[in-house]
A protein has these predicted regions:
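Bacterial N-terminal signal peptides
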Residues: 10-20
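N-terminal secretory signal peptides that target proteins for export/translocation
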Residues: 1-5
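Eukaryotic helix-grip
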Residues: 26-301
Length: 301
């Protein structure tokens, strides 16, 4: 290893250690950032309400042209998790707002041979969520329940060059549309970054005065029992800090990749928990041609 390489590695390590330390990496969540996030959420939830009320586009694949829908459904039946960005604008980092970034991703998976009631029983078992969603969920606890409304605690672990741990709480509400469809809305009510986790020095950083890797996390799940199984769709909208000048190479992978990876991982873990014997499909399987004749013969409600 050459001297220049050693110097570059040393400089990179120093930057990582410096950024992860307090207070060097700290940023502050501003009121105007919260206002813009809340405005985006209001617009997004209005869009979601319209799709539920229309009864025509419950899942994102319902809005596709027939040929495209057939192709996507064939991928789902091979066990793939389909994911896409819903963000607008040209930035690959997310939607720029004052003092932060909004990330909006949607994913869907199909799980054969299960029922809607079976699915809801698993996703509502919050005391055991850490067992199903490890390693990203390290701890979980149902704080309270009143009918279809839940208060939940999750300790989250995010790793992408940097590893960050968060203690988070959510208000979650489930709604039954009919005998085959349901949806839920989950709003984070408290997110605190944990410093020195699982050590005697463990403590929470002041809320909104941390590395800024996760300030808000709202998720919207939809469940539809049809075609001999259940489609599960989730849209996740999160708020993070903006990319700090000069440290894009370090911070951008975390802020840019974690939202989509976490969502895809959550749906894959849900599928595995519901039907453990189903093998995972690698990305190489995406090159296989679907059975279009069989898929075209199927008509969704």
């Amino acid at each position: 290893m050459g001297r220049k390489t050693i110097i570059r590695l040393g400089a990179g390590l120093l930057a990582v250690l410096s950024f992860a330390s307090e207070p060097a990496a700290a940023t502050k969540l501003q009121p105007e950032t919260i206002e813009e996030f809340d405005r985006y959420i209001g617009s997004s939830e209005s869009r979601m309400d319209e799709t539920v009320a229309s009864q025509r586009v419950f899942l994102w694949i319902d809005s596709l042209a027939e040929h495209d829908r057939v192709l996507e459904e064939a991928k789902l039946r091979r066990g793939q998790v389909l994911i896409r960005r819903l963000e607008t604008g040209n930035s690959v980092d997310g939607i720029h707002v004052r003092g932060g970034l909004i990330h909006d991703w949607m994913a869907i998976v199909f799980i054969p041979g299960i029922s809607l009631s079976h699915t809801l029983a698993l996703v509502q078992d919050y005391d055991h969520a850490a067992e199903h969603y490890s390693p990203e969920v390290e701890r979980s606890k149902l704080l309270s329940r009143s009918g279809n409304e839940f208060r939940v605690f999750l300790r989250l672990k995010r790793t992408e060059m940097l590893t960050t741990v968060f203690d988070t709480e959510y208000d979650i509400r489930y709604v039954t549309v009919d005998t085959s469809r349901a949806y839920s809305r989950s709003h984070s009510t408290r997110i605190s970054e944990v410093a020195d986790p699982d050590t005697p020095r463990e403590h929470e950083k002041p809320i909104g005065e941390d590395n800024g890797f996760l300030w808000r996390l709202y998720s919207y799940w939809r469940f539809e029992q049809v075609d001999g199984g259940v489609y599960i769709q989730c849209e996740a909208i999160s708020l993070t800090r903006d990319i700090p000048p000069g440290l894009g190479w370090l911070v951008r992978p975390f802020i840019q990749n974690i939202p989509s990876k976490s969502l895809s991982s959550a749906l894959a873990a849900t599928r595995k928990a519901l039907v453990p014997e189903i093998p995972r499909v690698s990305s190489l399987d995406q090159r296989q041609e679907p059975d279009l004749a069989a898929a075209m013969a199927r008509t969704r409600n």
